[in-house]
Amino acid sequence: MSYVIDRRLNGKNKSTVNRQRFLRRYRDHIKKAVEEAVSRRSITDMEHGEQISIPGRDIDEPVLHHGRGGKQTIVHPGNKEFTAGERIPRPSGGGGGGSGSGKASNSGEGIDDFVFQITQEEFLDFMFEDLELPNLVKRHITGADTFKTVRAGISSEGNPSRINIVRTLRSAHARRIALSGNSRAKLREAKAELERLKIEEPDNFGDIQKLEAEITRLRMRIERVPYLDTFDLKYNLLVKQPNPSSKAVMFCLMDVSGSMTQATKDIAKRFFILLYLFLKRSYDKIDVVFIRHHTSAKEVDEEEFFYSRETGGTIVSSALKMMQEVMVERYPLNEWNIYAAQASDGDNWNDDSPICRDILIKQIMPFVQYYSYVEITPREHQALWYEYESVREAFPDSFAQQQIVSAADIYPVFRELFQRRLAT
């Protein structure tokens, strides 16, 4: 009997390298399909894969052939239907690779589009590609990055000083049982048969000798299985885990006042869900502070931020004041990178808009890395937008404002706000 031991390090995903090469080759097609999927999906439905279709003409392999120049003499077979100069009509249907419309035809051929599925992980990778938090720097200077050594499981390769004896012997024992199991079963049967013959047929020397020879052969076969094989060796895997010295916090400020229609609130929630998904996926060490406001502001948890029905009037400065207070109390400026994203419909008590501008310019913007403001309205901008333009003029590198008219604008605006900047 033959035994096969799979020693491939990537046995279960043997096509992973080929798949990654394929994704790199057709990156433009996949990115376009992902952007179209984002525009038609609900933001809460982002953590799923997507079916990608690549036209058949784009998957042709390049070939070498003779150029069309020069003089050639070719003899073509004749026919009874056409004469020189006539045009051959295009088939009306059944040509292959079509959309399926039209009548059936008994002629024509083509290539269907190549359709494949990308995973949830790959979908999010393409979705958040080239995005980052702007101006992320090390605020807490402690010299070089520090690392700590942590256990990271068991490896088949390693330093002999880190060999795991228990796991090695367990693996060797399991291998010996697997490779000698059939021989051991036959050995037990032969011993039982030999005992029976010695009791019932003691004069049957021929069969007894055959069984004794078989028992000897089986024992030698079992003994030939090596006690320890290189495949059995297991080592304690130790890795260096960096201690991050860059810490970041994102303040999410959402207007839930009565002027915000349900559709506007839904767009604001979807924008922040997209932002939250981006932060949690891209950054392991980041705090998120949720602040809802109408006439008064309140710091809430994730559940209440996205699903609470509380509403009221509109005083935007209440949220900015609360953000400034939380910054001072919990996030020392010399240690934390501070970011903020604000969503509103632009409506505000008229006397409050200049207050918002002053709070931003004097108490918030000098201490934050980046502040983004999105105004969700199809109407003309109001006083708050124009006051914020003054803030943008004072802090052009760290303040950005964009308008969202419909749900289709959420993803393009999000990419515009958090597009990776080239180093200058």
UniProtKB/Swiss-Prot annotation:
Recorded source organism is Azotobacter vinelandii (strain DJ / ATCC BAA-1303)
- Can you name this protein? UPF0229 protein Avin_46880
Family according to the record: Belongs to the UPF0229 family.
Which PANTHER family does the record associate with it? UPF0229 PROTEIN YEAH (PTHR30510:SF2)
Enumerate the residue ranges of region (Disordered). 57-108
Biased-composition ranges, Gly residues, are 92-101
One Pfam family hit:
DUF444
Q: Which domain of life does the protein's organism represent?
A: Bacteria
